[in-house]
Amino acid sequence: MTIKIAVIGFGNIAKAIITPLLEKNLISPEDIYCLVNSKESLENIKKNFKYNVNIFQADSKESNLIWDCQVKLLSVKPQQLKEISELDNHKKNENLLVSILAGVSLDKLIQKFPNHRCVRVVTNIPITVGKGLTGISWGEDISEDQKQFTKKLFKNSSKIYEFTEDYLDTFLALTSSGPAIIALIIEALSDGGLSGGLQKKLSEELVMEMILGTITLIKQNNISTTDLRNMVTSPGGTTISALRVLENKNLRSALIESIVSASNRSKEFR
């Protein structure tokens, strides 16, 4: 049986999820039904998205077609949830609804879409380059086929982890807020190189290559971060001098607290 997918909100993350499936012919463009909020968005997608998917404005008559799709990928802004739920035709069909809305709990999804089987997903911005991390929490009565199809949506653009919902907030803090934290660290280290006389562009390149090389070394040699730190830290040397400054400035504690704070903030959005 052909499965039709409704994509409700067609931003960068939704495109990153759908595009690999189209590229690998795992789904056909005619089986994708996209719902957008404005004529501008509709025209932009028609002009710039290379696949000829079905696309409708939310206020058009044709938009009702999305509610008959077996799978809905919900990727609007969280504040649009009420508006979208009011468009639902409320047919009892037990179709699959996969939400990537930040901070919207399974309970709220089930409340807004009682005739669907709901799944809450957290993913992150590197999914747009095929390097995402995706956490999945299953709602009630999800069939095995629906679980497998949900994983199919994400496995071509990200690594998948399954959690009970209690852990999704921490997963979100680490993986979704994490890229901004890493970007800040890259900026700060690059500014350190700038202070030492390096050109900004070169300093940024060196920092990013250093981080990539460090991660590769840890993963390929299967060593711990402590092992690596000890490998490059000599008595009285430059590295221990740098680490001493960071410990005195409580960098470790600040990073831990940043994740705890982001996780707590995610819980407040539920």
Go through the PLM ranges and name each one.
Residues 1-6:
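Extreme N-terminal starter segment of soluble prokaryotic enzymes
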Residues 10-11:
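Glycine-rich Rossmann-fold phosphate-binding loop(s) that bind the pyrophosphate
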Residues 14-15:
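N-terminal Rossmann-fold NAD(P) dinucleotide-binding loop
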Residues 21:
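Aromatic pocket-lining residues of Rossmann-like dinucleotide-binding sites
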Residues 32, 42, 199-207, 228, ...:
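Small-residue helix-packing motif on alpha-helices
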Residues 33, 39-42, 48-136:
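Rossmann-like NAD(P)(H) cofactor-binding subdomain of soluble oxidoreductases
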Residues 108-117, 133-171, 181-220, 265:
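Internal alpha-helical scaffold of NAD(P)-dependent oxidoreductase catalytic cores
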Residues 208-270:
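NAD(P)-dependent Rossmann-like dehydrogenase/reductase catalytic/cofactor-binding core
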